[in-house]
Amino acid sequence: TQKTRIFIIEEKAQNQKASYNEDSFAMLNDVLDWCETYQVYAVVDFHAATAGQSGIPCDDGVDNGQHLYDDEESMERMFLLMEEFMRRYKDRWIIGAYDCINEPISMTPRREELTPKLVYFYEEMIRRCRKIDQKHLFLLNGTQFSSLTYFFDHEFDPEYHNWGISLHAYEMVVPEVASLASVLRTCREQKICLWMGETGGRNEHAWQTTMYEILAEYHAGYNLWCWKTVEGAGCASILNFNVPDEWHLITDYAINGAAKPSYEHAQAIWDSYLECLAVDKCKENTQYHPYLLREGNFEIPAIGYNALPMDSHRGLSDLPNAAGYRLYDRFELVYEKGYHPEPAGFAAPGPIKHPRDHVQL
């Protein structure tokens, strides 16, 4: 995952010229060398565009705004950076694709207004990059957390037709084909590939193995977001690590406005944090591996049955199931003892059930 300010020295990027941070490119080169050594394709994810593209705090936009679309200079800097990547890596076979750009136009009332500007950005980016690199695949993100893809209704790479859609989905998405129907239809109409650019999140084994089974059925690759957060419910990764004993002093100050640690004290905590990252101090989540790698011993929940009739399920019904799950299959569901879905239209008042309730079926 790449943040643009790691690679481009913005203060010097004036008059359509740019100065680049060679140390950052050297680190990326080391990663690509490692990928070649171990035969692991690299998807270079442009996760933060100049001036911000999503409205989400993680892309580091000023005031969390999507200024990429309104600021001509910032958009030009992004084009320059992309062109620089093409020059440096056009012959690097280990790069499988470029994933552009993370969850654009996601938290804003200006979505409809800005979407045409995003379309222009994608079209112009590909046009300029193709003058240098005619080989690599471009994976484009939809709006609203990469979920809305309706505007991919025409050819974005007219000369080479080497592009696809990057979708994101975590456990709040119901694990059924209906959740992917819109983007699958778009990919089918445009004759392009689907890539799940982000998925994983919490250790919801039932959700993950069901969703990955669907993706495999529709020939969609998927990328496990292998490190999401340090602590809490979202902490799910191949390797986890312990935080320093005084880590709470940092988070209490940053999140709750508690007393600010001194510079020296904060630096000591961060130094301890870095020491905790050493691989030999991490814990490997081996129970997580079978679900992610689709090998070894693991279970696919009953709700992840293959859609082909009479193959992995039996019991078609003329009545839809009360849980509202995979209604198009007309499959009669049998619930675990003690689970009683609310009848459609008669649900008790209160919060809507979390989609993960489906794993109780």
Residue ranges with predicted function:
Residues 7, 45-46, 198, 226:
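Residue-level recognition of beta-strand->loop/alpha-helix junctions
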Residues 214, 218-299:
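Extended, alpha-helix-rich binding/interface surfaces that flank or overlap catalytic cores
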Residues 4, 173-175, 232-233, 307-317:
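Short, solvent-exposed loop/turn elements at domain surfaces
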Residues 279-361:
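Extracytoplasmic
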Residues 79-83, 87-229, 237-249:
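Extracellular glycoside hydrolase catalytic/binding regions
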Residues 11, 49, 103:
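Active-site loop signature of alpha/beta-hydrolase-fold enzymes
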